[in-house]
Design a protein with these regions (language model features):
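Sec-dependent signal peptide hydrophobic core
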Residues: 13-18, 278, 282
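Short, conserved phosphate-binding/catalytic loop or strand-edge motifs used
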Residues: 175-179
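Right-handed parallel beta-helix
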Residues: 107-126
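Iron-sulfur cluster-binding cysteine motifs and their immediate structural context
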Residues: 29-34, 56-75, 98-102, 124-152, ...
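N-terminal secretory signal peptides and thylakoid transit peptides that target proteins
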Residues: 1-17
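Aromatic- and Gly/Pro-rich amphipathic surface segment
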Residues: 80-106
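C-terminal segment of N-terminal export signals and the immediately downstream linker at the start
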Residues: 24-60, 295-318
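Long, compositionally biased charged/polar accessory segments in the mid-to-C-terminal portions
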Residues: 207-305
Length: 318
């Protein structure tokens, strides 16, 4: 029997039927339990007033995560003049760049303000909540990490993220991979080391430490230099709080931040949204799970051949 076996097909069908039944009753089955973060987690305080736009952090991230070489070198400052779409949208992260620096020119400022963007590693991640296969994990260190072996490519996380950070790799339609900053978890964070971008910064724009301590440092800076900072720490409370937090010398809305977010975690809004589309929820997971199984079997066959003993045994059972 070629393609997906009947056993796998029936399994997918049963999963789809179960999802349909559950989705018509409640949305709780598709949401992870409420997660309030870890009190002793690590974080990063970003002081935008110190950034000079050198892009060293972009280069360090590229090396640490073994990402493709960029089309323009990291020394090329012309990227700051690039905009996308008719609304003048700045550069954003994608599957080839987990962090980007953009330049802003807020009113009343003598010099530009540079802002580094990456996943903010929410205390209560909406990407985790929206993922029905639990491909996301919030670690005790504070990182929100992703398991590509579990992901089925539904892209719910991209819709749910309030910061629009998860990026999708479109290189293969049947091999779903979401790309984003992982806080250098595998190579640095879990070993107690700061992320590569923090380590490389020549201006000490970023401070790595326990989140609670960083909040104290931030408010001390604001109190000591009220003329230098806006009296707000972005990320302390927004959407339930984030591991990456920001100080700014100009209004946050003028340097690319969404200031319309409230302090309620997106997790509750995700549940409300999922509750409005039960039939979509019923079809979407089963559809993408089926695609994922087809793709992985195809790759396995290409690697081992259709006569591989495992395939023959599976077909006998089906």
């Amino acid at each position: 029997m070629s393609g997906i076996s009947r056993r796998k097909f029936l399994t997918c069908t049963l999963i789809g039927a179960g999802v349909t039944a559950l989705s018509l009753k409640t949305t709780d089955a598709f949401a992870s339990p409420k997660l309030e973060g870890y009190p002793d987690s690590m974080g990063v305080l970003v002081d935008l007033g110190r950034c000079i736009g050198c892009r060293s952090c972009e280069a360090a991230c590229n090396r640490e995560q073994k990402l493709p070489e960029p089309a323009q070198s990291f020394d090329d400052k012309s990227v700051f003049d690039q905009t996308f779409h008719s609304n003048g949208q700045k550069r954003r992260t994608d599957e080839k760049a987990y962090t980007v620096v953009n330049r802003y020119e807020p009113a009343g400022q003598e010099k530009p303000v540079y802002r580094k963007s990456q996943c903010n590693h929410c205390n209560e991640p909406a990407c985790l909540t929206s993922c029905f296969v639990n491909a996301y994990t919030k670690t005790k260190e504070g990182a929100v990490i992703y398991n590509p072996k579990i992901c089925v490519g539904c892209r719910n996380c991209m819709i749910a993220c309030p910061f629009n950070m998860p990026a999708y790799s479109y290189s293969s339609a049947f091999n779903p991979v979401v790309k984003k900053c992982i806080f250098c978890y595998d190579t640095r964070l879990k070993n107690g080391l700061p992320p590569a971008c923090v380590d490389i910064c020549p201006q000490e724009v970023m401070t790595f430490g326990h989140r609670k301590g960083l909040i104290e440092i931030a408010h001390e800076r604001i109190k000591a230099n009220p003329e230098r900072y806006i009296d707000h720490l972005y990320g302390e409370d927004e959407v339930g709080g984030t591991s990456w937090m920001y100080l700014a010398p100009a209004p946050f809305e003028e340097v690319g931040f969404d200031t319309t977010m409230n302090n309620e975690p997106i997790i509750s809004n995700v549940k409300d949204f999922l509750g409005t589309v039960p039939m979509v929820l019923a079809i979407w997971p089963a559809l993408f799970t089926g695609f994922h199984l087809l793709a992985t079997r195809k790759q396995d066959i290409e690697h081992h051949g259709d006569d591989h003993p495992a395939h023959k045994e599976e077909d006998k059972k089906s």
